[in-house]
Structures are given as C-alpha cells and as structure tokens.
C-alpha cells in the first residue's frame, strides 16, 4: 500500500510540473503567430505605399509634361489674342471711318406680259382716274421699276434714307427721301421729308416686296396705287406687352386723292393706329384703323363724252379715306422657313365733296362749254388674299379685289345743265372686280421668280385676261421688310 501511494505521489508531482511548461509553449506559439501576422501586414502596407509612390511619381511626370504643353498653348493663345486685338483695333478704325458712309442697294425688276386688253387704255369704270401708274405692265418683255436705295446714320440722333425709282421710260423719280430720329424717348419716332404714308397695311410696303405683281384695286382707285406724303410723321409705340402703335402725319397733300394746292400750311392730315401680338408660338396678327383727309384744287382728268371726244373734267373739294386692315400669319412653332401662311385683307371707304367742272372748250367739237356744279361720292372697296409657302422657297397665293360704286351725285347731270350721264363715261355706275392667282420661287432671299394670272374686270364690258412672268433681284444690303 505504501509503495502504491509513493508511486501515485510521484506521478502526480510529475504531471503538476509539466502543465505550466505546456501552457508556456502554447503562449509562445500564439505570440510568434501574431508577430508573423504583423510582419505580413507591414509588408503589404509597404508594398501598397511603394505602389502609391510609383503612381504619384508617374502622375507628377505627366502633370509636368501637361504643364509644359499648357504653357506652350498659353503662349500661342496670348499671341493669337494679341493678333486678334490688333485686327480688332484695325477693324474698329475701318468701322469708324465707314460708320457714316451710306449703304447702297439696288432692286431690279422685269416682266413678260400677255393681256387680252390694251394696257395703254386701262381705266377703272365708275371711279375718277387717279393719274397714277395703276395699269398693267406693257405687253411682251419689259423692264419694271428699278429701285436705288441709299441709307446711313447721319449721327447718333438721325438716320437718312433716299430711294429713287428708275422707270422703264428712262425717268428718275424720288420715291422716298426722309430723315428719321434715333434717340427720341418714350417710344416716339419722328420722320420728315417724302415717305410712304403709314395708313393701311400695304401702303408702306415697297412694290418689290408685294405678294403679287400689282396693287389691289382699292389702292388703285382711292390712293393712286400707293399714298406718298411730303411732310412730317410722328409715331408712338406704347410700352405694352402687345404691339400698339399710334401715328399722325401733316403733309402737303399733293398725292391723289389730293393735289398741289399751292398754299401755306398742311394740305393733308393722316391718322393711324395699329395693334397686334402673338397667339401661342405659331400665330401672329395685326389690325389697324386709318384716316386720311386731304383737298384737291382743279384735280383734272380726261373723260370721253358721248361722242367719244376727250373732255377735260376737274374736281375741287375735300376727300376722305378710311381704311381698316388686318393680317394673320401662321408658322409652325414660329419657324417660317419650311411652311407658313399669310392672310391679308383691307377695307376702304372714300368720300368726296366739292364741285365738278365739265369743260369741252378745248375739244375738237365744243358743245356745252365750261360748266360747274356740285359733286359728291360715297364709294368703297376691299380685297382679301392668302399666300401659302408649302415648301422652302415655293409659295402660292390667291387674291380677290372688289370695288363698290356706291352713290355718286353729279349735279351737272342731275340738274339738267346739258351734259348727260353718257358724257361722263368713266363715272357711270359699275362695280369692278378681279381674281388673281400666283406662284413664285425664291432661289435665295435676294431673288424671286413669279408667275401670275388674273381675270381683271376693271373696265365695264371688257374682261382682261392677264398672264405675267416677273423677276425680282436684290443687289447689295437690304433691310428687313415690315411685318
């Protein structure tokens, strides 16, 4: 028993002494493993740092190279800027030298015409002749009106425009020659000289910019084709979100339905107002009301009597003209280059009150001599037209014109002074009308070719079937046309 106990004690002592040693060995192994892990992490971090350093050095080299290129580009840019500045200064000097030199442009026109009635015998039945150039162009090939325009700023306060008309008969006429203010405040503009009146819509548009070759019948009958003023005009454009314009004119009144009165003061007065705006992105409109008051003194015209002998008649008195105009334009989303439509119409009312003189003393066979009595007329007319650009550069259009004879009181006839209504053949009751169609092609904004056909019933009992081929060419700078 004692031996067994001794052996047990010895075994226990041995186990007790070996347990700490095992524990110490396990701890050392853990420490060694941690050190190895730290070493691996350190090596990985060093590798990462070395990689970042290499990348940074590479980027720095690239940046240095780019900086050199940028410096070279900057030097080139600076040199170019210096050259541009020198060029701009030189151009500025040239601009300053030419700032007040005029811009010159030329409009050339010509026609080929075929008519069933003689254009030399054109008149409008039922209405006093205006004496203006209202008839069709000459038959066959013919030169149209050539327009020479000169314009420039006079100084910071005024602009000057001169437009000369060169006729096919080799005569020169001043169509417009006026100054216009540039610096009046509050939306005012003053114009003085000879100018196209602001009444109506088409009156201010030059002939080469018309949508048809000739003027509508109401313009021919009541304004002699278009109304020109020698005087002054004041316009005011209101500061409103829509277009609102009011204007007035004082002038000599030498144009039909007036004539040269050879007196001091104004011979004619014109007032007009226009309002317009946009409807969405695709529509624009304008409408207006105009009034013209003028006087005539022995405004003469030739009228064949009942024997077909020309007799000189003359009117003295007052003339008034009212005009109502309207325009509607359509262009998809405001872009008119592909397609667009323009609707245009005007209504005219004319009143004349005064005296009419019938004088056949200068005729080959005088019958009644010189007779004078009262005369008055109330007449009207209108036209409507539509022009459609159906594809770029191509347009087609249609216009209808009509005049209404209304009421005419010729006291020479009514009071039985001798001449009968047949002795005033041009003033007999008649309602003229006309149908016109056209198609035109514009290779560019500087040229246009047009084919126009019309059935003109201006002359009583004589329908004039017309075919016109027209060319229009613009040379030099030309300003934008009116709305």
Task: List each model region and its residues.
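Outer membrane beta-barrel
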Residues: 91-256, 263-282, 289-291, 378-380, ...
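A short secondary-structure junction signal
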Residues: 246-247, 257-262, 299-302, 357
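Hydrophobic alpha-helical segments, especially transmembrane helices
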Residues: 4-6, 33, 46, 195, ...
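A broad helix-preferring feature
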Residues: 27, 50, 57, 64, ...
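Hydrophobic transmembrane-helix microenvironments that flank and shape a buried ionizable site
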Residues: 31, 172-173, 322, 343
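Outer-membrane beta-barrel pore domains
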Residues: 135, 178, 203, 211, ...
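Gram-negative bacterial Sec-dependent N-terminal signal peptides
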Residues: 2-22
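N-terminal periplasmic/intermembrane-space "pro-region" immediately following the signal or transit peptide
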Residues: 11-13, 22-124, 128-131, 243, ...
């Amino acid at each position: 028993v004692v031996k067994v106990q001794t052996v047990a004690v010895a075994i226990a002592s041995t186990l007790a002494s070996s347990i700490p040693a095992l524990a110490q060995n396990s701890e050392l192994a853990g420490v060694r493993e941690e050190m190895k892990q730290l070493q691996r992490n350190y090596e990985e971090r060093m590798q990462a740092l070395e990689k970042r350093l290499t990348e940074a050095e590479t980027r720095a080299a690239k940046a240095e190279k780019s900086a050199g290129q940028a410096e070279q580009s900057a030097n080139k840019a600076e040199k170019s800027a210096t050259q541009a500045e020198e060029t701009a200064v030189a151009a500025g000097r040239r601009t300053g030298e030419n700032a007040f030199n005029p811009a010159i442009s030329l409009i050339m026109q010509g026609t080929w015409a075929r008519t069933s009635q003689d254009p030399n015998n054109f008149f409008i039945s039922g209405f006093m002749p205006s004496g203006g150039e209202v008839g069709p162009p000459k038959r066959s090939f013919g030169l149209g009106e050539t327009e020479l325009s000169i314009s420039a700023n006079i100084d910071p306060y005024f602009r000057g425009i001169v437009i000369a008309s060169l006729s096919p008969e080799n005569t020169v006429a001043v169509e417009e020659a006026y100054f216009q203010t540039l610096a009046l405040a509050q939306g005012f503009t003053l114009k003085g000289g000879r100018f196209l009146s602001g009444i109506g819509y088409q009156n201010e548009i030059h002939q080469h910019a018309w949508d048809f070759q000739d003027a509508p019948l109401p313009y021919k009958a009541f304004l002699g084709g278009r109304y020109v003023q020698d005087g002054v005009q004041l316009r005011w454009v209101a500061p409103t979100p829509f277009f609102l314009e009011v204007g007035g004119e004082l002038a000599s009144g030498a144009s039909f339905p007036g004539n040269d009165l050879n007196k001091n003061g104004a011979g004619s007065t014109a007032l007009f107002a226009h309002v317009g705006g946009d409807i969405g992105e695709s529509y624009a409109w304008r409408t207006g009301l105009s009034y013209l008051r003028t006087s005539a003194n022995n405004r003469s015209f030739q009228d064949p009597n009942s024997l077909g002998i020309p007799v000189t008649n003359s009117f003295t008195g007052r003339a008034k003209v009212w005009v109502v105009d309207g325009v509607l334009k359509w262009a998809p989303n405001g872009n008119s280059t592909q397609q667009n439509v323009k609707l245009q119409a005007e209504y005219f009312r004319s009143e004349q009150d005064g005296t009419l003189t019938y004088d056949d003393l200068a005729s080959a066979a005088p019958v009644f001599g010189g007779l004078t009595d009262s005369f008055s007329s109330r007449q009207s007319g209108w036209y409507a037209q539509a022009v459609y650009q159906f594809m770029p550069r191509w347009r087609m259009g249609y216009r209808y014109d009509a005049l209404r004879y209304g009421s005419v009181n010729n006291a020479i006839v009514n009071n039985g002074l001798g001449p009968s209504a047949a002795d005033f053949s041009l003033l007999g009751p008649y309602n003229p009308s006309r149908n016109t169609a056209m198609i035109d092609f514009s290779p560019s904004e500087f040229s246009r070719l047009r084919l126009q056909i019309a059935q003109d019933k201006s002359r009583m009992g004589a329908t004039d079937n017309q075919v016109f081929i027209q060319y229009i060419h613009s040379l030099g700078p030309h300003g934008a046309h009116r709305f």
